Amino acid sequence: MPIQNSPYNAFATLLSSSGHPVSPAELHGLLLGRSCAGAGFEVDGWLVDAAELLEGEPQDNVRSALIGLQEMVKGELTSDDMTVVLLLPSDDAPLAERAAALGQWCQGFLAGFGLNSRDSSALSVEATEVLQDLAAIAQVQDALEESDDGESDYMEVMEYLRVAPLLLFTETNKTVAPAAKPSLH
């Protein structure tokens, strides 16, 4: 029996009933992407980017949900255990629906990262490869088939996507050590 009250389904219902033609996965990807690019966690900047994706100003209930989502992401990225929970359909949803949401999440992440990245040429080889992987995943969202192999592939990609933002966030939010002051002897 499908889980009707999953966070993904609740957010999807809220967005569609408010007239916003976007998936929760893409919205969550956008938020994580912008956060990992160094945009910070200021609510106003997030709401501006979200409104653009939503194709209009969000109503109060959607605005509250967006702020809550941002607080969740901030907590995930700044806590000691740094664990990212992806906003995707539940495991009992059809594989095609979950795979499409993974692709939408990647598209959102890349958009958020691209809009807010200060200097992508300064990224490490590993970080650049992560972004290339996300672009590839966004393109193959329809390639997973309903089978044990398809399910296994989906889980593998999902686990990768839980780790990828952490690498990018850590890299783009490195604190630069102050230069040592010359001592006067």
Curated annotation (Swiss-Prot):
Q: Which domain of life is it from?
A: Bacteria
Q: Which residues form the signal peptide?
A: none
**Which cellular component appears as one GO term in the record?**
cytosol
Pfam families from the xrefs? UPF0149
The cross-references to NCBIfam families, in alphabetical order and at most eight, read: PRK02166.1 (NF002562)
Q: Which family does it belong to?
A: Belongs to the UPF0149 family.
Family matches, as PANTHER family: UPF0149 PROTEIN YGFB
Q: What is this protein called?
A: UPF0149 protein PFL_5969
Upper lineage: Bacteria, Pseudomonadati, Pseudomonadota, Gammaproteobacteria, Pseudomonadales
